[in-house]
């Protein structure tokens, strides 16, 4: 049997053994937020690395906004393409109630930065045919959106000795936000994106062992061979680790199974989040 260095070794016929971090007190912790819808307006827009529209939003509704997790997601509601109107649900004691037949287009986004008062920054990945990308390309100062959330955050300690991040372009903003706070002895990034664009976007990669895996195609569950091969070469510790996986939904599931089943990692310290789904 070929043994890949890793979190644990699972041999046939034996009880699976997970080698946990020093204690579960080191596990990421969830916090909840009260759900609110907030009206925000475009304050400025800049193209970044020829791959993202960075839009700074402002508004008094941002008072009390809280985003404690580096990969939090907020729901961004876009105006009706025909009428320009924003239709929102009602928040009741029983939850969210939508008006019959009215459901605006919405997408999930990770807050890149918030000044704690009234300025929120989002990066919109530029691609063809995307509702959010198209809106961002046309956005002008004063244009209005509505956001909801984040309803909850996963607060991940910044000082795990070993940290490994896998993402495509859609996950780069979350990694950029995370990178500013990381204190790790070993930090790996495996990014399914063009190296030049990735480096231009992330800028400071000091202390990061970066692997770029762009093949000109989107991350899919059936084309992960080069990524898995690269991961096989990375020796994983038995404690003090954190692994973050994001990208296309089915691909993320394959990667999650790779770490928790093939490499024997503790699922408490493997964070797998689908950022988009192949239709």
Descriptions of predicted regions:
Residues 2-7, 13-279:
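Extended, composition-driven regions rather than compact fold-specific motifs
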């Amino acid at each position: 049997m070929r043994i890949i260095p890793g979190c644990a070794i699972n041999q046939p016929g034996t009880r699976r053994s997970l080698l946990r971090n020093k204690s579960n007190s080191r596990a990421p912790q969830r916090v909840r937020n009260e759900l609110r819808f907030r009206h925000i307006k475009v304050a400025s827009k800049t193209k970044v690395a020829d791959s993202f529209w960075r839009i700074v939003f402002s508004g008094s509704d941002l008072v009390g906004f809280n985003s404690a997790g580096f990969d939090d997601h907020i729901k961004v509601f876009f105006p009706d393409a025909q009428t320009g109107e924003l239709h929102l649900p009602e928040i009741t004691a029983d939850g969210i109630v939508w008006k019959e037949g009215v459901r605006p287009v919405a997408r999930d986004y990770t807050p890149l930065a918030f000044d704690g008062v009234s300025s929120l920054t989002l990066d919109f990945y530029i691609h063809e045919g995307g509702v959010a990308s198209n809106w961002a390309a046309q956005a002008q100062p004063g244009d209005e959106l509505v956001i909801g959330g984040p309803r909850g955050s996963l607060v991940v300690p910044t000082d795990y000795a070993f940290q490994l991040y896998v993402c495509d372009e859609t996950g780069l903003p979350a990694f950029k936000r995370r990178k500013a706070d990381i204190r790790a002895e070993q930090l790996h990034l495996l990014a399914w994106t063009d190296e030049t664009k990735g480096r231009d976007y992330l800028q400071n990669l000091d202390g990061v062992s970066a692997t770029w895996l762009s093949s000109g195609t989107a991350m899919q569950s059936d084309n992960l061979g080069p990524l898995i091969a690269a991961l096989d070469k990375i020796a994983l510790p038995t404690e003090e680790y954190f692994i973050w996986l994001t990208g296309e939904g089915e691909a993320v599931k394959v990667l999650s199974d790779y770490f928790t089943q093939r490499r024997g990692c503790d699922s408490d310290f493997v964070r797998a989040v689908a950022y988009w789904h192949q239709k």
